[in-house]
């Protein structure tokens, strides 16, 4: 079962639908409606931290979940979830040079993790005004995807099964969204 933590974003339900279409059992919980003890009782095999309209500091239990389950349960962070993952390990989340709300752009990737077997570059949909500051990304993460302007679009922990993508694979305008999420499920 996948636990999908909803950071009060409508795209959470697109993620839910995509994962269900891929055959996964998914339970959705709001970021302020569960505790670590509740998560332990649910016993998820994977955790997904959803997009959301806020900063990682305002994303309810998301940071605590990442810190507590890192290295124990595979996790994927999407947009805000990606930012929260980086921040949980010490990176700074800063204003992007250009706001990208509902815009598509090409993203180049290294073919690893969730990008395995996908063409590069990919056209993806972006909805964000914040990004992970590359100068502050800890060494425990590798950058797996980047925009034309070298903004971080994907990260992967070097030892643990943790990955984040800044863009929205669940958006209809993103290429290979199902395939990317399927790569996460296969682990």
Swiss-Prot record:
It is an enzyme of class 2 (transferase). The active site is at residues 79, 168, 170. PROSITE patterns: GATASE_TYPE_1 (PS51273). Residues 1-187 form the Glutamine amidotransferase type-1 domain. It comes from the Bacteria. NCBIfam families: PRK08007.1, trpG_papA. This is Aminodeoxychorismate synthase component 2. The lineage of its organism: Bacteria, Pseudomonadati, Pseudomonadota, Gammaproteobacteria, Enterobacterales. The gene is pabA.
């Amino acid at each position: 079962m996948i636990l999908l933590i909803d950071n009060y974003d409508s795209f959470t339900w697109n993620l839910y639908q995509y994962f269900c279409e891929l055959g996964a059992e998914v339970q959705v919980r709001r970021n302020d409606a569960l505790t670590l003890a509740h998560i332990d009782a649910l016993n998820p095999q994977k955790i997904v931290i959803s997009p959301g309209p806020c900063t990682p500091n305002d994303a309810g239990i998301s940071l605590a979940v990442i810190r507590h389950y890192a290295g124990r349960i595979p996790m994927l962070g999407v947009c805000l979830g990606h930012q929260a993952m980086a921040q949980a390990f010490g990176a700074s989340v800063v204003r992007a040079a250009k706001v990208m709300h509902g815009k598509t752009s090409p993203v180049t990737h290294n073919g690893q993790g969730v990008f395995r077997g996908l063409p590069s570059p990919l056209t993806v949909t972006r909805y964000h005004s914040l990004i992970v500051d590359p100068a502050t990304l800890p060494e425990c993460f590798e950058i797996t995807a980047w925009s034309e302007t070298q903004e971080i679009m994907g990260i992967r922990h070097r030892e643990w099964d943790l990955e984040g993508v800044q863009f929205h694979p669940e958006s209809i305008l993103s290429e290979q969204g199902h395939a990317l999420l399927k790569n996460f499920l296969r682990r």
